[in-house]
């Protein structure tokens, strides 16, 4: 009984201490506000127009993600283009992301920012890049084959060791005199 009472008093003390440390109106600042969350998927033309106005878009340009249960709601489906493709000389409100205030951001903006995926068209077409890559790899494989088939080593003499060609270390009889080895000097 005394242990239960001590436990209850300890819990009450912790609750009072926590109430004194953190004010009741405090919350974490990382949550998305209710205004930032997408609304329900628009079913009527009036709802579509209201959603387009909410995201500062024209009704003709507004197209929501398909209602397949992923939770995109009325968020607009923007083209899959990276921020790198946008004009670098324009006076953006947020120049690092190349965005203006009130402009809808791509749902996967973290994937399309400038230091990640670059979807801009390449100056050389894909087929030519592949031809150059595979041509280089084929040439290098051919050169490796030639080098393996026709080796070109520097001519060397036989390996020379000190102490009568390591006679004892190579298992020679210590009682016998080793045969003399001629060492060549350069």
Swiss-Prot record:
Q: List GO BP terms, alphabetically.
A: mitochondrial electron transport, NADH to ubiquinone
Q: How does it sit in the membrane?
A: Single-pass membrane protein
Ranges annotated as spanning the membrane: 133-153
Ranges in a coiled coil: none
- Disulfide bond recorded as keyword: no
Q: Which UniProt keywords apply?
A: Electron transport, Membrane, Mitochondrion, Mitochondrion inner membrane, Respiratory chain, Transit peptide, Transmembrane, Transmembrane helix, Transport
Q: Where is the protein found, in the record's own terms?
A: Mitochondrion inner membrane
Q: Which GO terms describe its cellular component?
A: mitochondrial inner membrane; respiratory chain complex I
Subunit structure, interactors included: Complex I is composed of 45 different subunits.
Protein purpose: Accessory subunit of the mitochondrial membrane respiratory chain NADH dehydrogenase (Complex I), that is believed not to be involved in catalysis. Complex I functions in the transfer of electrons from NADH to the respiratory chain. The immediate electron acceptor for the enzyme is believed to be ubiquinone.
Name the UniProt record assigns to this protein? NADH dehydrogenase [ubiquinone] 1 beta subcomplex subunit 8, mitochondrial
The species this protein was found in: Bos taurus
Name the gene that codes for it: NDUFB8
